[in-house]
Amino acid sequence: MKWTGWLTAILLLLGGGSQAQVQLNLEDVVAGKIIQTKGMGAMSWLKDGEHYSRVEANVEQGGTDIVSYRAKDNTREVLIPASLFVDKATGKPVPVRSISWSADNSKVLVYTNTQRVWRYDTRGDYWVLDLSDKSFRQIGKDRPESSLMFAKFSPDASKVAYVSENNIYVEDLVSQSVKQLTTDGSETIVNGTFDWVYEEEFACRDGFRWSPDGQYIAYWQSDTEGTGVFDMINNVDSLYPKILHFPYPKAGTTNSAVKVGYVSVNGGATTWIDIPGDPRNNYIPRMEFIPNSNELFIQQLNRPQNTNKVWIAKIGSSKPEHIFTDEDKAWVDTNDHIRWLKDNQYFTWESERSGWRHLYRVSRDGKDIQPITAGDFDYISTVGMDMKKGLVYFIASPDNFTQRYLYSAKLFGKGEVKRESPMDEAGQHSYSMSPTGKWAVHTFSNAVTPPVIDMVSFPGHKSVRMIEDNAEAKAQYQALGLRPKEFVKAKSGDLMLDVCMIKPANFDPNKKYPVIIEVYGEPAGSTVQDVWSGGDLWNQYMVNQGYIYVSIENRGANAPRGREWRKCIYGEVGTFACEDQARGIQDLARQYSFIDLSRIGITGWSGGGSQTLNCMFRYPSVFHTGIAIAFVSDQRLYDTIYQERYMNTPQNNPEGYRKGSPITYANGLEGNLLLIHGTGDDNVHYQSCEMLVDKLVEYGKMFSQISYPMRSHGIYERKGTTLHLRKSMAKYWLEHLPAGGK
């Protein structure tokens, strides 16, 4: 339906312009048909820093064009027409999933025919298009179909390296010869990529790096022998069950042995870096070549993850040099924004050593550590740098923990931190900055404003032109007459917690309404943010039924509130969260008389499902109905890296694991509880649900349960799943938590 017709329909529903709230249709909410926003899509800045490229559909001819835009004036040029992305053997176009440029922008690597590996489509086929002669050919043709992973050009664009079936290969683009660099890859020896737990918890997928001179490949190797193997049963796709086996180290058990080494692109033996420490009880989550050098910069975490040791290893040697250690009594994080300064004399480093997360400048020998940002606020992430002006651009939000803004600071010398984002745009700002720091694609949104995307220039954050204002989506949102998300505060003891709230349709402040609380509550996420979330249409749908939507940010959540806020929960995950949720909703009821404390519901997914259970079991007088989805019932069941980071091992902290696990308090259930889990969840295993069910049955506790066959942690695969899930949730709320004002 075109916008004019859609708007007419809405106005008719509104009774000729009334601002009454439209009754949302759940099918349309799930299908994403109600508010449609436009974005930039995938883009890449080109090496000149003045142009960026995008993949765009060629509507007239079909297929995909690679198009460049000049940042200054939006001059558009088709760099590679869709007609070049054709398989000459078949005459058919090759679908473009994504592209990557060579360093000199002379060639493009095309990723296609992709397959999912756990979370993402990281396995597929690759083709190379050479702009000099317009040739287009597939690489790795001798390997099995859709088996290549993480292909990337050598620095001089003469070769491409890739992983296939746990081995690393290098293909010469001129001679088309292929050199196999590793030969020991197997089910248990993994070269150039990672096992399940490194991928999930360290975001490690691409496991090899080209040396700057193109003569060596450095890579990770994981030996999963001895790691516990988890079995998932597929009962729905064949007459007899199929078993999926994969190594999964649960808290306190044996990890894979991980090491790093380097090998010549001409072949030969791998030189392994001799980093001290048991490879099964230390982690190597990050490794990169220092720019324009033959040296590797390696981060090593100990198993408790409370120290991060930095090593430099030179090609030609197996002995690394230890230069720097960051440590914390709770845990430290890996550094993903390392930038080298002044001809590699210094590098940037993020640390919470001052009590706040800040960016530091560290000398190459690790002896001189100076703050680049400082103050009682958290640096969040680096956006880019202007090396000529000696500036770093970064995200922070000193005055409002739910928002995000761009700031700048000097890399050397003293100077005040300067806000760059416009003062009149309250919400969250994100940026894709050019390599020179001169231009950036800027996206602004807040809870009631769809993304507004413009090109800005620096210095000065000047808006050069609008790229997408999403005016149509804004009009669609406003035409619905939805209640806005409000941001308020609630107390938990002496702490002030951030809270967001949506009031029901036809709200009457003199009546009392039931509340549905959405919780996550664990260190890996945050739920109270002033950012566009598609209009919060699922929550708005439930609000339409006569509920108040609430989310409370408890201690330990990943909010920019300082080290103590985030790490006070160390060793006690699951304890403070439910305490803050209970205190928070009670304080809200003291502030707002329209909250009905006799009708409080709570729901969450993953860690939020765990906290839902903790709240239901430990505070049954506060929480009366709960829906727990894809939850961890016993913290011992989850993986080593995540659980031990925040809890240490079960052997070292048995009481913390007992107190933080919902299953410990299952006998406390008094209210209505719906358990939802996918049997194909490789992340939080269905075992977690079954163990809790077993315990609830033992205690004679009544509950409801929905199991989704072979759905993963997101419970979205297979036809009809998402709609069925949301319908089931809505039905349960309406049947067990009476809606409407009283």
List the model feature ranges, each with a label.
Residues M1-L7:
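Bacterial N-terminal signal peptides that target proteins for export
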Residues M1, W196-Y198, Y646, I663:
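Hydrophobic alpha-helical segments, principally membrane-spanning helices and signal/leader peptides
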Residues G15-G17:
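N-terminal signal peptide c-region/cleavage motif recognized by signal peptidases
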Residues A9, A20-S430, K438-W439, S445-P451, ...:
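Beta-propeller folds
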Residues L7-L13:
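Hydrophobic alpha-helical targeting segments used for export or membrane insertion
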Residues W6, V22, G608-G609:
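N-terminal alpha-helical segment
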Residues V229, P285-R286, S293, P422, ...:
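Serine-hydrolase catalytic core recognition
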